[in-house]
């Protein structure tokens, strides 16, 4: 997810990085974790770690007033997204949008595209709904659920024009790297839901995770890198306050943009 400017928001940066994920907070490993028994880990991968968050009065009002229109309940059937958005347009899935400021900015910058934002934490959902109302955005819908399950159940194969995964939890301790979202089985799942020629854009402020992302994405046979290694930041991805602060301190940010190969 992209980091937003509320220092008390889910995903506010930790001491040694410029940013932190809203949908995947640094948390202690769950007791009884049996990832090692499953070499693919796909059933164990989650796009978030459960944690509490305070919903403000404004966020609650936005949820109550705008949620019925803009929040799509999770279900096991694939919705008619054209009917939901009221048009047929390029469709982008964003996994973990945090407090939603950057999501709203991208949607405003690209009014011809439709965005499905997935975020489990209610304060972030309320914050994005508030921005949707304030900016009168019609090209965003929200699913408050685990992105792994949303992708498997609610998104048709070969249907997405793009996927954004900005600043996911780096799980910086080596023994926790297996919990990182960007792993071969999940990348294969993402690629299967992209249209040929569609893009997957990841960003991180952890060099070790950037290196792993590059390795994993490069190894997927259905994807190709749009750059030699790391990509320049695309103009549509905003630079957040925390990212600017980190850059001033000499911290790096790495963008990776891959495309799904055309058949043949």
UniProtKB/Swiss-Prot annotation:
Known pathway: tRNA modification; N(7)-methylguanine-tRNA biosynthesis
Region spans: Disordered: 1-39
Gene Ontology terms: cellular component: tRNA methyltransferase complex
List of catalytic residues: 169
InterPro entries in the record: SAM-dependent_MTases_sf, tRNA_(Gua-N-7)_MeTrfase_Trmb, tRNA_methyltr_TrmB_bact
Keyword annotations: Methyltransferase, S-adenosyl-L-methionine, Transferase, tRNA processing
Coiled coil stretches, renumbered: none
EC numbers: 2.1.1.33
Disulfide bonds: none
PROSITE patterns (alphabetical): SAM_MT_TRMB
Leading EC class: transferase
Binding site for substrate: 173, 205, 240-243
Entry-linked Pfam families: Methyltransf_4 (PF02390)
Comp. bias intervals (Low complexity): 18-31
Catalytic activity: guanosine(46) in tRNA + S-adenosyl-L-methionine = N(7)-methylguanosine(46) in tRNA + S-adenosyl-L-homocysteine
Sequence similarity: Belongs to the class I-like SAM-binding methyltransferase superfamily. TrmB family.
Biological function: Catalyzes the formation of N(7)-methylguanine at position 46 (m7G46) in tRNA.
Full protein name: tRNA (guanine-N(7)-)-methyltransferase
Gene coding for it: trmB
């Amino acid at each position: 997810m992209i980091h937003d400017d509320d220092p008390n928001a889910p995903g506010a940066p930790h001491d040694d990085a410029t940013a932190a994920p809203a949908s995947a907070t640094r948390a202690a490993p769950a007791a009884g974790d049996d990832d090692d028994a499953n070499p693919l880990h796909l059933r164990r991968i989650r796009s978030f770690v459960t944690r509490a968050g305070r919903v403000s009065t404004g966020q609650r009002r936005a949820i109550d007033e705008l949620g019925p229109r803009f929040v799509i309940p999770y279900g096991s059937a694939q919705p008619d997204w054209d009917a939901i958005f009221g048009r047929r347009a390029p469709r982008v899935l964003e996994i973990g949008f945090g407090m939603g400021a950057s999501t709203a900015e991208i949607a405003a910058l690209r009014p011809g595209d439709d965005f499905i934002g997935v975020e489990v934490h209610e304060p972030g959902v309320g914050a994005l709904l508030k921005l949707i109302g304030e900016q009168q955005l019609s090209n965003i819908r929200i699913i408050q659920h685990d992105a792994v399950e949303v992708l498997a159940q609610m998104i048709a194969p070969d249907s997405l024009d793009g996927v954004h995964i900005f600043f996911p939890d780096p799980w910086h301790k080596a023994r926790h790297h297996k919990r990182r979202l960007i792993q071969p089985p999940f990348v294969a799942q993402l690629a299967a839901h992209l249209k040929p020629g569609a893009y997957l854009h990841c960003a991180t402020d952890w060099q070790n995770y950037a290196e792993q992302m590059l390795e994993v994405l490069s190894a997927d046979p259905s994807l190709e890198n749009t750059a030699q290694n790391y990509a320049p930041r695309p103009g549509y991805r905003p630079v957040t306050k925390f990212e600017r602060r980190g850059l001033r301190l000499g911290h790096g940010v790495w963008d990776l943009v891959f495309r799904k190969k055309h058949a043949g």
